[in-house]
Design a protein with these regions (language model features):
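Predominantly transmembrane beta-strands of Gram-negative outer membrane beta-barrel pores used
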Residues: 1-8, 14-60, 67-75, 83-87
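Outer-membrane beta-barrel domain signature, strongest for Gram-negative TonB-dependent receptors
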Residues: 65-171
Length: 171
């Protein structure tokens, strides 16, 4: 069993970070929201730029991924706390149909690979009241996943789709 916990944000001062990696960039915030530091925010967002790298390399597919997470926590008193959390992603893969003189391998991949869009998230809210001998915790949450695959004849969007798949799940 795995137990993962998001920590609270920094109650005393703003901290931020910009991240530039080989394939993505991101931003993180870790900060008080209220003057007294009882409400804090911890948040991050990341986005790939693989689509630009893959295009320069002449690859026939151009992926992009995005993900985010956050926790907004508020200490309502010595024994009470409220929080909101979220974690999610949205990704898509499109075909590089602008290749000049694609080779046989590129043509093969362009011929069968569909484009897709995918997203997922979980959001939750919780309330905690601490007693001397225990605690009361009330939590509500929602999660969802969407996956769409599609392919057009000869990769021409004015022609009919040969693949049109869409699934959505949520709890």
């Amino acid at each position: 069993v795995m137990d993962m916990r998001m920590r609270d944000g920094n109650p005393t001062r703003f901290k931020g970070k910009l991240i530039l990696g080989a394939s993505d960039f991101g931003i993180n915030f870790d900060t008080p929201v209220s003057r007294n530091g009882k409400t804090t925010l911890l948040a991050s967002y990341r986005r790939s730029y693989l689509q630009m790298l893959f295009s320069v390399l002449g690859l026939p597919f151009l992926p992009t991924y995005n993900d985010y997470q956050f926790k907004l926590a508020s200490k309502l008193g010595a024994s009470d706390e409220f929080y909101l959390i979220g974690l999610g992603s949205f990704d898509y893969n499109r075909l590089n149909t602008g290749l000049k003189d694609p080779d046989d391998d590129q043509k093969y991949i362009l011929g069968y690979l569909p484009e897709n869009r995918q997203s997922s998230y979980v959001f939750g809210a919780g309330y905690v009241h601490r007693f001397r001998a225990g605690q009361l915790r009330v939590v509500v949450s929602r999660n969802a996943f969407t996956n769409k695959l599609y392919k057009h004849e000869r990769n021409d969007k004015s022609l009919p789709r040969t693949i049109d798949y869409n699934t959505e799940q949520s709890d």
